[in-house]
Amino acid sequence: MFDHILAKSNGITLQQHLEDVAKIAVCVAQNVGLDPEIARMGAHLHDIGKASPIFQERLKQKNLPPCALVFRHEIASLFFLSLIEDVKKRQTITRMIIAHHKSVCEDIGDKGFLDLDDIESECFSYHSKDFELWSKEALGILKELGWQVRPISIEEAKSNYDETLAYCRSLTP
């Protein structure tokens, strides 16, 4: 149903990628004494922002022109955090999503989540472009993966983004 939404340029679908990552994450969590449910949820959410048409289009392009703001799929993935009701689980999964490519801040090249602070409003606007459309497909994928889903408005997505900013700021000295 969602085979047109890819995770990688090699043709693997986003849904398959999230299923594969979840299997590995659950196995690792069980073997090291961590919560497998949190591992599964984090694995499912970590790349869900790849459902954005911006990411999908950039995935198809071979020679990408340099642009002022690179699409960071992990930022778009944050828009779905309110599907997790438990605050502690949500905070743990927030760290998983934010840190799976870059650090929270002072990343090499100043590309950590908090390093984007000076372009905060532009960052949200860019990553949430057409959210009302692509979020339906992202939620459809999550539903196929066994999640209880509900519509997420652009306002709720912004609230999730703002909550993540506040939480990440609380982690830094």
Set out the residue ranges of the language-model regions:
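Accessory nucleic-acid engagement/destabilization modules that flank
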Residues: F2-K8, L14-P173
